[in-house]
Amino acid sequence: MAIQSSSSGSKPPAPKRLVAPEATAAEGDGGRDEGLRPRRLADYIGQSELKQVLGIAVEATRLRNDALDHVLLYGPPGLGKTTMALVLAEELGVSCRIASAPALERPRDIVGLLMNLQPRELLFIDEIHRLNRVAEELLYPAMEDFRLDLTVGAGPAARTRSLELPPFTLVGATTKAGSLSSPLRDRFGLIQRLEFYSCSDLEAIVSRSAQLLQLELAAEAAAEIARRCRGTPRIANRLLRRVRDFASVRGIAAVGAPVVVEALAMHRVDGRGLDPSDRRLLSLLETSYGGGPAGLDTLAAALGEDPDTLEAVVEPFLLQLGFLQRTPRGRVLTDAGRAHLEAA
């Protein structure tokens, strides 16, 4: 069972878009999605290569009766990094303490976490690329030698006091592996990327979640949700909940594909998972700039969006679908993107 960190750091605001991959406050650790998480590797759908690598590491750790090597999980948001950390803890029969790097502002925050670890426990740090320098440097000897080096005093009278820590496993999660410093990255024994999920895996995830939610969902309905969730289980479960709400209010006991289409059309999510923000960008490129190229700042100003938000939140999925291209001269609408607009 996960043990929540007691830090007072504020949570990020909930995303306004239904198809945003970031977790809302209600979906976070201990939130609504907690009951939908798989508990064991055998229950974890998708990420077959990752499961194989971690399965071997877990079994070897059991045979040695030792702590699992430190693990770095990276990839886009919503793909199951937190879930995998909790699964690893369950497989090893230990607790998992959860913290977010932005909340570890002061040295005593990370010191408190490390000092309270039990032998072979997991410490999960989300957004680990956002650790400040002091917290990161405290982790170096802790990860390498299970030792905590504390500086006592200041100036010429300062001295270092070393405290032994029990063997533990740090599981770091990040969407920006390239932002980690080399000394921190090199201390992870296992570095694994989570990939976007296939449509068949997402259908299985949606069907499993529907059973847990006690929702009668037809196979073709699960497929409709899977096609719209951008390869991301978190979005799949969010869309499923909106379909469940719709069916409940309309008094629909058995949910088929037409119900899913109607329910998600109310939220303006189309058959490829695009929402109004996505379509506005594609439409602007076509109608105002002849398909492009158009600069990011120009597009952001025309849409009333922040350029960083446009680049980090709206564009990635359009690039993944091949509806948009980034060129040295600016953004360009592809033939596939134009065809999608015409079909809408």
Swiss-Prot record:
Bias (Low complexity) occurs at 1-10
Question: Which SMART domains does the entry mention?
Answer: AAA
Query: Which molecular function terms from Gene Ontology are attached?
Result: ATP binding; ATP hydrolysis activity; four-way junction DNA binding; four-way junction helicase activity
Positions of the UniProt region annotated as Disordered:
1-37
Q: Which residues are DNA-binding? A: 326, 331
Pfam families per the UniProt record, alphabetical: AAA_lid_4, RuvB_C, RuvB_N
Q: What domain of life?
A: Bacteria
Q: What is its EC number?
A: 3.6.4.-
Please state the protein's primary subcellular location.
cytoplasm
Enzyme group, top EC level?
Answer: hydrolase
GO BP: any one term = DNA recombination
Binding-site list for Mg(2+): 82
The protein's location, in the record's own words, is: Cytoplasm
Key words of the record: ATP-binding, Cytoplasm, DNA damage, DNA recombination, DNA repair, DNA-binding, Hydrolase, Nucleotide-binding
The segment annotated Head domain (RuvB-H) runs over 271-344
Q: Which residues bind ATP?
A: 36-37, 78, 81-83, 144-146, 187, 197, 234
Is ATP-binding tagged as a keyword?
Answer: yes
- Membership in a protein family: Belongs to the RuvB family.
Give the domain section of the comments. Answer: Has 3 domains, the large (RuvB-L) and small ATPase (RuvB-S) domains and the C-terminal head (RuvB-H) domain. The head domain binds DNA, while the ATPase domains jointly bind ATP, ADP or are empty depending on the state of the subunit in the translocation cycle. During a single DNA translocation step the structure of each domain remains the same, but their relative positions change.
Q: How does it assemble?
A: Homohexamer. Forms an RuvA(8)-RuvB(12)-Holliday junction (HJ) complex. HJ DNA is sandwiched between 2 RuvA tetramers; dsDNA enters through RuvA and exits via RuvB. An RuvB hexamer assembles on each DNA strand where it exits the tetramer. Each RuvB hexamer is contacted by two RuvA subunits (via domain III) on 2 adjacent RuvB subunits; this complex drives branch migration. In the full resolvosome a probable DNA-RuvA(4)-RuvB(12)-RuvC(2) complex forms which resolves the HJ.
Give the protein's biological function: The RuvA-RuvB-RuvC complex processes Holliday junction (HJ) DNA during genetic recombination and DNA repair, while the RuvA-RuvB complex plays an important role in the rescue of blocked DNA replication forks via replication fork reversal (RFR). RuvA specifically binds to HJ cruciform DNA, conferring on it an open structure. The RuvB hexamer acts as an ATP-dependent pump, pulling dsDNA into and through the RuvAB complex. RuvB forms 2 homohexamers on either side of HJ DNA bound by 1 or 2 RuvA tetramers; 4 subunits per hexamer contact DNA at a time.
Protein name according to UniProt: Holliday junction branch migration complex subunit RuvB
Species for this entry: Synechococcus sp. (strain RCC307)
